[in-house]
Amino acid sequence: MVSASPPKPAISDVPPEDFVQSPKVSKFIDVRSRLEYNLFHAPNAINLSLPRILMAQVPLLRYLVLPRWFWQLPKDEPLAVICLTAHRSPMAAQMLVKLGFSQVFNITGGMMAWQKAGLPTHRDHVKE
């Protein structure tokens, strides 16, 4: 008798234009710094910087550097990551797979491609 094995964790590269047409993801994570995120970001994207994600490799730091909402995410639901030019988001995607997420979308070209495609962005107004 052959038992079905769980699906192999996958990272899928997807252009911004295709991503906005795809089914919803449980979370859309912008891995840039807080400053970069505040300047402009995709709608519904939540900021969780790459350094914080990478620090989660250290078991003792894991629960200190990642927010509570992160630990409540279902590991089998799609998750997406974006950065400025798609140099940081692939590293974040790999780490998310190591943390047990099975479906991770990496937005190719990052926020630069997002803007070039004419997709909407938001800006956070930070009080000085």
Give the role of each language-model region.
Residues 1-27, 34-78, 87-128:
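Rhodanese-like catalytic fold shared by cysteine-dependent sulfurtransferases
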Residues 82:
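Short, surface-exposed ligand- or partner-binding patches at beta-edge/loop junctions that are enriched
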